[in-house]
């Protein structure tokens, strides 16, 4: 499964709020909500986050194997 835990750590490390992403960078609140709920987002949005946060994709998402 894909985890967005790195996304939240990166936001904290860079002192950027979700409000700033929405108001300054035109990220929709629906996209933030999808991330909060662990749902999928597009590769375009992943690219946007990497550009905005000046980070790599591993700072946004990580793969966590299912425990089955």
What are these regions (language model features)?
Residues 54-68:
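Short C-terminal boundary/hinge segments that cap the last helix of small helical domains
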Residues 12, 23, 51:
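Alpha-helical residues within the helix-turn-helix
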Residues 39-51:
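Short, basic-rich loop-to-helix N-cap that marks the start of a DNA-contacting helix
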Residues 1-20:
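A short, Lys/Arg-rich alpha-helix, primarily the initiator
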């Amino acid at each position: 499964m894909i985890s967005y835990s790195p996304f939240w750590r990166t936001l904290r490390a860079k002192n950027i709020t979700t409000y700033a992403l929405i108001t300054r960078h035109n990220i929709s609140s629906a996209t933030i909500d999808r991330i909060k709920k662990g749902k999928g987002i597009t590769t375009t949005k992943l690219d946007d986050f990497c550009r905005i946060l000046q980070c790599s994709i591993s700072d946004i998402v990580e793969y966590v194997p299912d425990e089955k």
